[in-house]
Amino acid sequence: MIAARAANLQVAMKALALAVLALAYAAATARAEQCGRQAGGARCPNRLCCSRWGWCGLTDDYCKGGCQSQCRVSRDGGDDDVAAVLLTAPGGGRAGVASVVTSDQFERMLPHRDDAACPARGFYAYRAFVAAAGAFPAFAATGDADTRKREVAAFLAQTSHATSGGPYSWGYCYKEVKGATSDFCVPNARWPCAPGKAYHARGPMQIAYNYNYGAAGEAIGADLLGNPELVATDPTVAFKTALWLWMTARSPSQPSPHAVVTGQWTPTPADSAAGRAPGYGLTTNILTGGLQCAGGNGGADRVAFYKRYCDVLGVGYGPNLDCFGQAPFDGDIMSASAAK
């Protein structure tokens, strides 16, 4: 089964060759530094460290070597340390994603990610997830409690499908495609490929192509054009790339998955005519460019992961779970799991 999933991921890479993503809109909205003297003295949310370059994070690159504020925490603590120290709300208790999904619930959702059969074993840690989420303060912090739970369930469901070794508790089994036959480098003046580097699918959302690595790296403060391997070696960076794809609208007419699941998107008459409606199903449409909206097992798998995770979090599923019959926005593909 795992070999078959690997083959499916390779097929997904070929499907991505048909898409050219419109990144100008995303890059224009994600360029500014986040903290410190570069941002008027602002502090990072959730008590993350502010690096010398003005970016928020948890690793030693952020917390040491010129760190500007909130520098006492490094990534060496355990999961409980991250929740208690980094994600403490001003009035006590937990804040951010740690207030929505606990480490125990994370383990229940992804019990096999560290199985010996999974190439990503030991990589996708809860502490890396909550640290990465701290760089996106609106994630799991928009709307009421049920909305926040559904967003976490939706994000983990889509990324579980992208990295799955089987249904529906084998999410996060893979961290990159093995044996890629292409370097996924295409001509791009703004995001040129670095010599000898490959931009195949990596991380929870299986980010691929130099233009995605470049834009994501700029947004999170990492040189992913020069060091794309970071997405498969640094779990916090890996989660940040997935969250960037989740939080970023690809064009003014196409919402981010975050905007959809948190109720911030309202369909236009053109959207309604195209069958596009609020709900988890629309995130599949956005992430796959509509490739899984004509039926097939891929869309059904995504729904099954989502339902299971909603059950773990104790929240209802909401409407419109699949995208069957929905027209794509513009054919762009955000996730390399589009053909799975």
UniProtKB/Swiss-Prot annotation:
Reaction equation(s) it catalyzes: Random endo-hydrolysis of N-acetyl-beta-D-glucosaminide (1->4)-beta-linkages in chitin and chitodextrins
Superkingdom of origin organism: Eukaryota
Expressed in which tissues: Expressed in pistils, stamens and lodicules.
Pfam families registered for this protein in UniProt: Chitin_bind_1, Glyco_hydro_19
GO-annotated molecular function: chitin binding; chitinase activity; endochitinase activity
Oxidoreductase in keyword set: no
Keyword annotations from UniProtKB, A to Z: Carbohydrate metabolism, Chitin degradation, Chitin-binding, Disulfide bond, Glycosidase, Hydrolase, Plant defense, Polysaccharide degradation, Signal
PROSITE patterns registered for this protein in UniProt: CHIT_BIND_I_1 (PS00026), CHIT_BIND_I_2 (PS50941)
Enzyme class per UniProt: hydrolase
Protein family (similarity comment): Belongs to the glycosyl hydrolase 19 family. Chitinase class I subfamily.
Annotated function: Hydrolyzes chitin and may play a role in defense against fungal pathogens containing chitin.
Record's protein name: Chitinase 7
Organism: Oryza sativa subsp. japonica (Rice)
Gene this chain is encoded by: Cht7
